[in-house]
Curated annotation (Swiss-Prot):
Plays an important role in promoting lung pathology in both primary viral infection and secondary bacterial infection. Promotes alteration of mitochondrial morphology, dissipation of mitochondrial membrane potential, and cell death. Alternatively, inhibits the production of interferon in the infected cell at the level of host mitochondrial antiviral signaling MAVS. Its level of expression differs greatly depending on which cell type is infected, in a manner that is independent of the levels of expression of other viral proteins. Monocytic cells are more affected than epithelial cells. Keywords: Apoptosis, Host cytoplasm, Host membrane, Host mitochondrion, Host mitochondrion inner membrane, Host nucleus, Host-virus interaction, Inhibition of host innate immune response by virus, Inhibition of host MAVS by virus, Inhibition of host RLR pathway by virus, Membrane, Modulation of host cell apoptosis by virus, Viral immunoevasion. Its main location: host cell. One of its GO terms (cellular component) is host cell cytosol. One of its GO terms (biological process) is symbiont-mediated suppression of host cytoplasmic pattern recognition receptor signaling pathway via inhibition of MAVS activity. Residues 19-34 have a biased composition (Basic and acidic residues). This is Protein PB1-F2.
Length: 90
């Protein structure tokens, strides 16, 4: 079997040090520049993915709060289609 020291996980931890927070706890801090950039990129990507979903939910919530005749008709038709589809498949 190979030695544990050869695994990429063990080698990659060499880039991590700790920093003290205000409450005295220590948290890991990435010192490697590429790792920090990667984390920033992932955070930005996640924000771009989550934002449209939040907008859709917000619009749905607004339409429920003050429905217009058109939005009510759309909701009823969608429900009816789903119900009909379910009836045909079961």
């Amino acid at each position: 079997m190979g030695q544990e020291q050869d695994t990429p996980w063990i080698l990659s931890t060499g880039h991590i040090s700790t920093q003290k927070r205000e409450d005295g706890q220590q948290t890991p801090r990435l010192e490697h520049h590429n790792s920090t950039r990667l984390m920033d990129h992932c955070q930005k990507t996640m924000n771009q993915v989550v934002m449209p979903k939040q907008i859709v939910y917000w619009k749905q919530w607004l339409s429920l709060r003050s429905p217009t005749p058109v939005s009510l008709k759309t909701r009823v038709l969608k429900r009816w289609r789903l119900f009909s589809k379910h009836e045909w498949t079961s």
